[in-house]
C-alpha cells in the first residue's frame, strides 16, 4: 500500500539498518564538501601575493585590519572551513553508534539534526561558491614571468625525444642547459591529447554531467 518494492522480513536486520541511510548521506555530502574545500584552498593559495594568479572584486573579498593593500579571500576560507566540518560528520556518526548493541537506541536521534544541518550547509556553500567563482579574474601572461620557465622543461625534453634523441640523452641535455644557465624554453605547443591543455573536452564533460544529473 505504501509503494515499497519489497518487505523487510527480518526485524533485527531492519533495526540494525537504523542510521545507515544517514551515514550514506554523510559520506556523499562529505565527498562533495571535500571537492569544494580543496577548490577553495587552491583559490586562497593562488590569491597569495607570492603567486597572484587570480583575484576577485571587492564584493567577494575583505580588507585587512592592518594592511591596506591586502584583500582577504574570506568567502573561500569560510567555505573551506565549513566543508571541513561537513567532512567530519561521518566520524561523528560512527562514534555515536560505536558502542551500541543491536536494536533501537535513542542515541540515533542525534543523527537527524546533524544531517539536516549539513545538507543545508552544503547547499549554501554550493550557492555561495557558484556565485563567487563567476567573479574570478585570471591574470594574463603568467607564464611569461621568467621564474616559471622551467615548467616547460619536460615538454622540451619530450620534443627532443620525438625528434630522435634517447630519453637519457634528452634529459641530460636539458639538465645541462639548466645548470649552465643556457636553457631557453620553447613555449608554443599544440596539444591534441584528450584532456590536455589544448583539448580540454569541455563539451564532453558537460554531456557527462548532464547524464549524471538526469
Set out the residue ranges of the language-model regions.
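Internal glycine-rich alpha/beta core junctions
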Residues: 1-96
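Glycine-rich cofactor/substrate-binding loops
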Residues: 67-214
Amino acid at each position: 500500500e505504501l509503494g515499497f518494492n519489497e518487505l523487510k522480513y527480518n526485524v533485527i536486520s531492519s533495526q540494525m539498518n537504523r542510521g545507515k541511510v544517514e551515514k550514506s548521506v554523510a559520506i556523499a555530502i562529505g565527498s562533495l564538501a571535500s571537492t569544494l574545500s580543496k577548490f577553495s584552498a587552491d583559490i586562497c593559495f593562488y590569491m597569495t601575493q607570492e603567486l597572484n594568479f587570480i583575484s576577485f572584486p571587492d564584493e567577494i573579498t575583505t580588507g585587512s585590519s592592518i594592511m591596506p593593500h591586502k584583500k582577504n579571500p574570506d568567502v573561500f576560507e569560510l567555505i573551506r572551513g565549513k566543508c571541513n566540518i561537513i567532512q567530519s560528520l561521518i566520524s561523528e556518526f560512527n562514534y555515536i553508534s560505536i558502542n551500541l548493541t543491536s536494536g533501537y537506541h535513542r542515541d540515533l536521534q542525534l543523527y537527524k539534526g546533524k544531517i539536516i544541518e549539513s545538507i543545508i550547509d552544503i547547499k549554501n556553500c554550493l550557492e555561495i561558491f557558484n556565485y563567487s567563482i563567476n567573479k574570478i579574474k585570471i591574470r594574463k601572461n603568467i607564464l611569461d614571468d621568467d621564474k616559471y620557465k622551467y615548467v616547460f622543461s619536460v615538454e622540451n625534453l619530450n620534443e627532443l625525444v620525438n625528434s630522435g634523441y634517447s630519453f637519457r640523452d634528452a634529459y641530460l641535455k636539458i639538465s645541462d642547459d639548466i645548470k649552465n644557465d643556457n636553457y631557453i624554453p620553447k613555449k608554443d605547443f599544440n596539444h591534441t591529447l584528450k584532456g590536455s591543455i589544448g583539448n580540454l573536452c569541455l563539451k564532453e564533460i558537460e554531456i557527462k554531467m548532464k547524464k549524471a544529473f538526469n
